[in-house]
């Protein structure tokens, strides 16, 4: 009988009810001691390990669990410490300061992890002295052993780690070579401690320019072979297809491939004989990035095909389960949709069902999952017809004409100031919202509280001297979840949390049916805020691309169709705001760049679809209505022309953590629309200085026409404390006032 093994690439850190987040934030707030934090996180790590053991995984990952980010863990492991933080003991407090900044130093850059909604802390190579300095990975491996867990260590590989880092005078190849002896030292320590194999994550090898890394990749793994450790290494790739013939030629013990998000290419390579059968194939057959239950019968067929071309097969999720919630156990969902879902724990159950079927000829669990999937598929969630053709996809007039009408209507000063949208969600705000959702207070009591909070912050903004105000979004838990709760076709879970960055957790809605706008979503709060001031108040919406990218999308319709359905719904809300007298409407697209496919052959169509959806949502307004949008920082060079094609009157972009890198993207384009490049980092509690903001403005004005430039923070201010926000915005406005006098 042919046998298979099961494994996992990583498990969610958050805990079922965000225990991880709550403990870390309590430590930051000095509500618990370091000893209490360590105990809570140790208990949670233990729970994760034993849960995976319960589902009979043959090997369980360690090194995926972290206090903030696994890339930052690797930086500290190799003493890659930002120059401004050097000279301190390498401990958890240093880790938190690098990630969040402190009163003296800015945080390291925060960038999307490939095309996911997870963010990593960018390693900085300026004036570093790499060495093995904090081998937490070894400690966690030994801890798993103490629990009698058959664990394998996980570490990001040298090619990926260096490619995702910045700074330093060495070339890419030189940095990799610098790290090789250090990786060897870590590998040897783990093997000596009993590791049967080590998972080396190299997702950079599925990207477009992976072929340019092949020489240094071969040199690196040849080095590990000469050191006697290569056969203990398993190179894991995910999120796209890999160059299998090249990977198979490397002297490692196993290769991991994604058979879900590869568009079928990896199986074709296997069937073409590109896989070296002397190695173990780690097949990512269960979707690690979406929440839908697997077609378990199709997975059985895939395993049969793979077994025909391999001698040793391990099945696993397509990527780390970091990207999905922990468990469905605490949810109370409608059966019609709930039967079609599978979170991290349920995905382990799917692996176990396939293991039992192939190894023990036990089909009980397999048959149960198969019947459940078939019941879900027999339902119809395609019920609506859409008239996409009747909605405008371009503004009535060019920007040069629109801006004249908008300026006449708004009468804004030189270098207008604004914020991105949200203000602090205090404990009181969260309590009122929770009490209202759980029917512990009346609608009237909740509405009164919201109005009081809106009025208070309108006055704060006026007192500070901002030019374009916002209502603060106190009614919203999350910028996507809020719309998921109000639009038809979405399901919002109770505990479906996933990690975005650090302790920031989001609860992505699940798109299961046709999307439709049925009633105003934001009009009441925005109109009320506008009634309190003579200054313009922005309507605040989330764009169709971001709603789709930050949701768990349905897989029974083409992505473009779902995206355009959302665009039509947002268009209805835009028009409702305009009809209510709102002069400035912001439609945020922070996730437009992150959804860009990893392979350039798919870029043009993705960007074309994204631009069309945004314009479908925003083009029906009159010329005098000003459309804003916002995007989070990433490598914008690839999409700068698409950003221009959105034809938004004003775009604000998160830039401060890039330390000026993003400004370079504007050197090759004459950006002739309104733009605000964020002048301070909202992810850090640190208050910027007037000089820092002035420097950021001056740097931006080297590339941006002053008449088009806006001044704003990097992003929404929801996660900051009230006093931090007031102090930082006061500094911002004072810097702008001084600049206007020049």
Curated annotation (Swiss-Prot):
UniProt-annotated binding residues for L-homocysteine: 420-422, 473, 588
Pfam families, A to Z: Meth_synt_1, Meth_synt_2
Cofactor note: Binds 1 zinc ion per subunit.
Binding positions (L-methionine): 420-422, 473, 588
Keyword Ubl conjugation found: no
Positions in coiled-coil regions: none
First-level EC class: transferase
Listed SUPFAM superfamilies: UROD/MetE-like (SSF51726)
Pathway(s) annotated for this protein in UniProt: Amino-acid biosynthesis; L-methionine biosynthesis via de novo pathway; L-methionine from L-homocysteine (MetE route): step 1/1
Positions annotated to bind Zn(2+): 630, 632, 654, 715
Domain of life: Bacteria
Stated family: Belongs to the vitamin-B12 independent methionine synthase family.
Protein name in the entry: 5-methyltetrahydropteroyltriglutamate--homocysteine methyltransferase
